Amino acid sequence: MGLQSGWKGYSFSLSTVVFLVLILAMAASATERQNNADYRARRVALAKSMEGGALVLFAPTEAEGPNNLFGFRQEDSFYYLTGWSEPGAAVLINSNPYVEIFFLAEHNVTQEKWTGPKLGPESPDAAKVTGFDKVESLDKMHDELLKILPQPRAIVYSDLGSNGLTAPSTGPVEWLRRGNSFPNYVAFRDAKPLIARLRMIKDAGEVQFIKNATNASMAGHVAALKAIHTGISEREISALMQYEFGRRGCERPAYAPIVGSGFYSTVLHYSEDDHIMKDGDVVVMDVGGEFSMYATDITRTAPVNGKFTARQREIYNIVFGAQEAAIKAFQLGKSKLERGPDNDSLYKVAYDYINTHGKDLHRDPLGKYFIHGLGHHVGLNVHDANDPAPLNKGMVFTLEPGIYIPEEKIGVRIEDMFYIDQDGKLVMLTQGLPRTAEEVEAAMKH
């Protein structure tokens, strides 16, 4: 039976909405990409950060799973360096002298009847399309790698082991790893830390994609606030939010949507979304879309009946105050997101605020109910690659304090997206989305 009356102002049934979400996701799957020059600049920067040697990276060979509704998604770092969204490719970079080669599988006529035409290494425009100096067949990687490796000592950077689905053509690297060809000759190093340091600083194109994801997802949150009422299911609100960001160009959710009401507002990674919202409860909505591979991460908390109780408002305002305290404490090049007693930790600022404002039913401070970190970097992954460096220009991250009291069935989290611009200013990318308790209540009025 369709839930025709579920969304106020909408006449779709739930089944229709889910269908529309999937159709919109498929329609949006033609991922936008940056200019080839942007990806090349990243490869050159990575080569400069390497201590000599060569880098070898492989794309996964298959989709995420046999029943994956959203299709293949490229591995984050491979996409960051290549802009290539299809499976079964590889990249080889030598640091000095700089050499870059992209490897593609040969055309497979039978397979392409199922998957559609693919760019092959023999295509005359392969170099132009990919933006690489040279494009070769995957079968030639073995020979190309041997041409590059120096003697008597070779360093090979890779991220083998981070990909569950490894291409058959990883053979050359595995061959070197075993030392069958050059015993005591090849030293392997992990490329992930080097790539992470690059990925944590976003360029203008990346920031724009994140803004697109954020704006589309904000529309989903606004629609949800208008639609929430006693008796509606968490799943309906989740579907509505995905519909709204899907119709604005997001190809998929950036993570499993979380819509938890009542007791489930206190469960951090609750993803069943299968309960009916009850009068007097709050609902936590942690939902964001992915635009052209780039994520956003937004959370809002709302009263199911449109009006916070006095106790809910008290907890909400403490969480809001903690976020405001962290924002005001931000210092360029000094503040950190990580937990710890360090006075430069924004987490400590938020925690101290929560722990000195309000009590639980047993008159204990509320700090113990703030059970997660304050924030994380966002980019190609919703919990993006980074290192513990202080916050600086070009970084995109969340600030998301929360209080979760199971005994009272009250969970409150407020999560916003932030970017540090080239002037060193902290910019809230979710500016305009209802954030105070009063703004949330006003947005829910019909």
Q: Each PLM stretch: what is its role?
A:
Residues M1-L3, G9, M26-H446:
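Active-site neighborhoods and metal-handling regions in enzymes and metal-associated proteins
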Residues S13-A25:
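Bacterial N-terminal signal peptides
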